[in-house]
Curated annotation (Swiss-Prot):
Protein name: Holliday junction branch migration complex subunit RuvB
Family: Belongs to the RuvB family.
Matches recorded under SMART domains: AAA
Alphabetical keyword list: ATP-binding, Cytoplasm, DNA damage, DNA recombination, DNA repair, DNA-binding, Hydrolase, Nucleotide-binding
Chief location of this protein within or outside the cell: cytoplasm
Assembly mode: Homohexamer. Forms an RuvA(8)-RuvB(12)-Holliday junction (HJ) complex. HJ DNA is sandwiched between 2 RuvA tetramers; dsDNA enters through RuvA and exits via RuvB. An RuvB hexamer assembles on each DNA strand where it exits the tetramer. Each RuvB hexamer is contacted by two RuvA subunits (via domain III) on 2 adjacent RuvB subunits; this complex drives branch migration. In the full resolvosome a probable DNA-RuvA(4)-RuvB(12)-RuvC(2) complex forms which resolves the HJ.
């Protein structure tokens, strides 16, 4: 068994967060530029088409937009598309960068009419900055303090009408006053294999990589429902195809490349398997407490809860119960193990989503 550490966690090939600034540059080159080119998220895309067209006809700024959902699903891409479809400029920042009220005021006062301000990780705004944002969103005004001490006074500045697009992976951490100021709220969902296959084929075309439909589907099925992961795997499979094959990405070539990268047919890597195997072999399938599990695999509790578990739970391989983590029937089948007769089904620990 290969041991992993925090650095390895951050560098997982199937991580949904950007691995480096270099990867972010690569992502920008592959981003769709119009809603018509945006694959998936049909409901969100349909809503935005109507709202954007209505705002353009009235020559008004688009209502403020909140995009939330797991990382890597296209929130930043949608923000850029919104600005491009509206025909305006986009200014981009993130919640942690805006440390002081003056940082936000400088951005707001430099916006032109109907511009888009995109704040990523908006749930990480400081309370001081958030207070400045409220009147800006409602009345296109901000209050700034001039002077210090007893001579200090508040001055109200008028702003150009603008659209705030906020993105977050943790909508529950937004304060109610901030959430209520967004007129358009959209949740981005995980993609299915067919949608990801279309994304892979489009990206391969932009990269001048030769890929057949089955090769694209093989990559898509292991991409954990996330376009960012699909594009990252495509790059690595392309490298493999150029060196070990004739450059053509087929299903067999993709399978061999992904096996070399330790990405299995359901998108698990070594860390996923390490966690599930610990539950199966060290704790007899569970239940096991999170602290015991963290000690057993040498990972931090937060890493397990925030990085490893969400996908495993979402796909039905892991259950959180009041007594601890439990491997599901699907996990036993995935590892080719017989299911022990321990009465867990009667206790509700192995119920499948349909109750069977």
């Amino acid at each position: 068994m290969i041991e992993t550490d925090k650095l390895a966690t951050e560098q997982r090939i199937i991580a949904a967060t950007p691995a480096s600034s270099h990867e972010e540059v690569f992502e920008r080159a592959l981003r769709p530029r119009q809603l018509d080119d945006y694959v998936g998220q049909e409901k969100v895309r349909g809503q935005l088409e109507i709202f954007i067209e209505a705002a353009k006809r009235r020559s008004e700024p688009l209502d403020h937009v909140l995009l939330f959902g797991p990382p890597g699903l296209g929130k930043t891409t949608l923000a850029h598309i919104i600005a491009r479809e509206m025909g305006v400029n986009l200014r981009q920042t993130s919640g942690p960068v805006l440390e002081r009220a003056g940082d936000l005021a400088a951005l707001l006062t430099n916006l032109e009419a109907n511009d888009v301000l995109f704040i990523d990780e908006i749930h990480r705004l400081s309370p001081v900055v958030e207070e400045i944002l409220y009147p800006a969103l409602e009345d296109y005004q901000i209050d700034i303090m001039i002077g210090e001490g007893p001579a200090a006074r508040s001055v109200k500045l008028d702003l150009q009408p603008f659209t705030l697009v906020g993105a977050t992976t943790r909508a529950g951490m937004l304060t109610n006053p901030l959430r209520d100021r967004f007129g358009i709220v959209a949740r981005l969902e995980f993609y299915d294999a067919e949608q990801l296959s279309r994304i892979v084929r489009r990206s391969a075309s932009l990269l001048n990589a030769q890929i057949d439909p089955n090769g694209a589907l093989e990559i898509a099925k292991r991409s954990r429902g996330t376009p960012r992961i699909a594009n990252r795997l495509l790059r690595r499979v392309r490298d493999f195809a150029e060196v070990k094959a004739d450059g053509q990405i087929t299903a067999a070539v993709a399978d061999a490349a992904l096996a070399m990268l330790d990405v299995d047919p359901v998108g698990f890597d070594l860390m996923d398997r390490k966690l599930l195997e610990a539950i199966l072999y060290k704790f007899d399938g569970g239940p096991v407490g999170i602290d015991n599990l963290a000690a057993a695999i040498g990972e931090e509790r937060d890493t397990i809860e925030d990085v490893l578990e969400p996908y495993l739970i979402q796909q039905g391989f892991l259950q959180r119960t009041p007594r601890g983590r439990v491997a599901t029937l699907l996990t036993y089948r995935h590892f080719g193990l017989s299911v022990p007769d321990t009465g867990r089904t009667e206790r509700g620990e192995w119920d499948t989503p349909d109750g069977k």
